[in-house]
C-alpha cells in the first residue's frame, strides 16, 4: 500500500512540479495577486514592496553559498572521503543505508541546520558509491528529511531569539514578552524533546518503508570525488602556493579565535561560525592553499540556483509583509485568520499550521518570526497560552513545510547533483507524517 502511495506521489511531483526557479517565479505571481486582492494595494505599491525586499537576503545568500561551497570542499578532502567511505561500508543493504543517512542528517540538523544539510548530502553521495542497489533519489530525500528537526535544535532562530532578550524581543513579540525565556523552556521542554524523539524513530522507518521496487541506481563512478593532483613547483611563487606552512598559520589563527569564541559564548553555533569551521577545516584537510582553492573551484558549480533564486524569495517576503495605509499586510491577514478560529486548546496547533502556510511564502525563520511573532504571541497570551509554547509552535511550523520548499533543498541538491523533482515525491509523505507527529505533540503535550 505504502509503495503505491509513494509511487503515485513521486509520479505526480515529477510530472507537475516545475523547476525551482520557475516555482519561485510562479510563487511571486501568486503572492502578488493575493496581496493586491486582500490588502487593496495597487500594482505600483506591490512592485515597490517587491523591489524593496528583493535584495534583503544578500548577506544570507552569501552565507548559504559559502556553507555549500566550504562544506562540499571539506567533504572532498582525502581524509574526509576516507572517513565517509568507511562509515558508508557499515550498512549491508539499501534499507540500512536509508536508515543510516536519515539518522546522520537528523543528528547534524539538531546540532546546526547548515551542518545537517551539508553532511546529509555528502554522506548520501558516499553511501551511493558504496551500497549496491540503493535508490539514489530516496537516499537524498532521506538526507533532506533530517532537516525537519532543525528549529527544535541548537540553531533554532526563534528559541535563540527568545533566550537573547532585549528591546528587540519586546518588539518582535508585540509586547507579549519583556524578559528572556531560556532554552530550558523551549528546546529542552518535554514536549519538544518528545516530538524530536518520535521523529528520530519514525522518519528513518518511514524512509525505509518507501523504498521502490525498482530503485533508481546511480553509477558510483559519477559520484567519485576528483582529487587534486600534485603539480611540479619550479619557481619560488609556485612553491609558496603549495606551502603547508601558510595554511597551518591561518588554521592556527582560526583555532585561537574559536577558542576565545566558545570560551566566552559556550557552544553557540551561529551560521558564520559553522562556515568558518568548514572553511578552515577544509584548508587543514587539503594541506595547501593551492589544493584547497582547486577544491573550492570544483565545489562552486553548485551555487547557481542559490545565487539566482534567493532574491526572488526575498521579494516574496517583501510583498508578504508590505502593509497598506492602515497597516494591513497579506502575512498579517493569513495569521489573523488562524487566530480567529482558535481556542486555548487548539491555538498551538493552529499556530503551527499557520506558520507552515506562511513558511511556503516566507521561507526564513527570522522573516517568519518578524511576520507572525508580533501577532501570534499577544493572541496566545489573551487565550492563556504560554508564550514559549506559541513561539515553538511557530518554530515547528517553519521547519515543517521546509520539507517541500525548494528554497532550502537547493544547497543539498547542489551537492547531490539532483533536481527538486527527484526528491519531492518522497518529501510529501514525510510532510504528512511529521505534520501529524508535531501537531499531536503540540495538542496533547503542551
Regions from the PLM with identified roles:
Residues 90-123, 310-324, 335-378, 383:
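Hydrophobic alpha-helical transmembrane segments of multi-pass integral membrane proteins
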Residues 2-11, 168-295:
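Long, contiguous bundles of hydrophobic transmembrane helices that form the permeation core
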Residues 94-109, 133-157, 161, 176-180, ...:
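Alpha-helical transmembrane segments of multi-pass membrane proteins
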Residues 16, 20-29, 50-78, 266-328:
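Core transmembrane alpha-helical segments of multi-pass membrane transporters/permeases
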Amino acid at each position: 500500500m505504502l509503495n503505491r502511495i509513494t509511487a503515485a506521489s513521486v509520479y505526480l511531483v515529477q510530472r507537475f512540479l516545475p523547476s525551482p526557479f520557475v516555482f519561485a517565479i510562479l510563487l511571486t505571481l501568486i503572492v502578488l495577486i493575493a496581496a493586491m486582492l486582500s490588502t487593496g494595494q495597487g500594482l505600483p505599491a506591490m512592485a515597490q514592496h517587491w523591489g524593496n525586499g528583493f535584495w534583503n537576503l544578500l548577506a544570507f545568500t552569501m552565507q548559504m553559498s559559502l556553507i555549500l561551497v566550504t562544506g562540499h570542499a571539506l567533504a572532498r578532502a582525502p581524509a574526509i572521503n576516507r572517513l565517509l567511505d568507511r562509515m558508508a561500508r557499515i550498512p549491508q543493504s539499501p534499507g540500512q543505508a536509508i536508515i543510516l543517512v536519515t539518522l546522520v542528517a537528523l543528528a547534524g540538523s539538531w546540532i546546526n541546520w547548515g551542518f545537517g544539510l551539508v553532511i546529509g548530502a555528502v554522506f548520501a553521495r558516499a553511501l551511493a558509491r558504496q551500497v549496491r542497489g540503493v535508490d539514489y533519489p530516496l537516499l537524498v530525500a532521506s538526507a533532506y528529511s533530517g532537516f525537519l528537526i532543525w528549529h527544535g535544535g541548537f540553531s533554532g532562530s526563534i528559541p535563540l531569539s527568545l533566550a537573547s532578550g532585549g528591546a528587540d524581543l519586546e518588539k518582535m513579540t508585540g509586547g507579549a514578552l519583556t524578559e528572556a525565556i531560556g532554552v530550558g523552556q523551549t528546546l529542552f521542554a518535554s514536549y519538544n524533546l518528545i516530538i524530536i524523539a518520535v521523529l528520530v524513530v519514525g522518519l528513518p522507518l518511514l524512509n525505509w518503508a518507501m523504498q521502490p521496487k525498482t530503485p533508481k541506481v546511480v553509477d558510483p563512478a559519477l559520484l567519485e570525488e576528483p582529487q587534486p593532483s600534485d603539480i611540479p613547483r619550479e619557481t619560488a611563487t609556485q612553491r609558496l602556493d603549495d606551502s603547508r606552512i601558510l595554511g597551518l598559520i591561518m588554521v592556527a589563527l582560526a583555532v585561537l579565535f574559536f577558542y576565545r569564541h566558545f570560551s566566552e559564548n559556550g557552544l553557540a553555533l551561529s551560521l558564520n561560525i559553522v562556515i568558518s569551521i568548514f572553511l578552515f577545516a577544509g584548508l587543514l584537510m587539503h594541506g595547501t592553499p593551492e589544493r584547497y582553492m582547486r577544491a573550492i573551484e570544483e565545489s562552486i558549480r553548485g551555487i547557481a540556483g542559490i545565487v539566482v533564486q534567493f532574491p526572488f524569495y526575498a521579494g516574496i517576503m517583501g510583498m508578504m509583509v508590505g502593509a497598506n495605509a492602515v497597516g494591513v499586510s497579506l502575512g498579517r491577514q493569513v495569521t489573523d485568520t488562524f487566530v480567529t478560529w482558535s481556542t486555548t486548546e487548539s491555538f498551538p496547533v493552529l499556530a503551527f499550521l499557520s506558520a507552515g502556510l506562511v513558511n511556503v511564502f516566507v521561507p526564513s525563520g527570522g522573516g517568519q518570526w518578524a511576520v507572525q511573532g508580533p501577532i501570534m504571541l499577544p493572541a496566545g497570551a489573551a487565550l492563556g497560552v504560554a508564550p514559549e509554547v506559541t513561539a515553538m509552535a511557530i518554530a515547528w511550523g517553519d521547519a515543517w513545510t521546509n520539507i517541500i520548499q525548494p528554497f532550502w533543498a537547493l544547497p543539498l541538491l547542489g551537492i547531490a547533483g539532483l533536481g527538486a523533482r527527484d526528491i519531492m515525491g518522497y518529501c510529501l509523505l514525510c510532510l504528512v507524517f511529521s505534520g501529524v507527529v508535531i501537531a499531536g505533540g503540540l495538542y496533547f503535550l503542551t
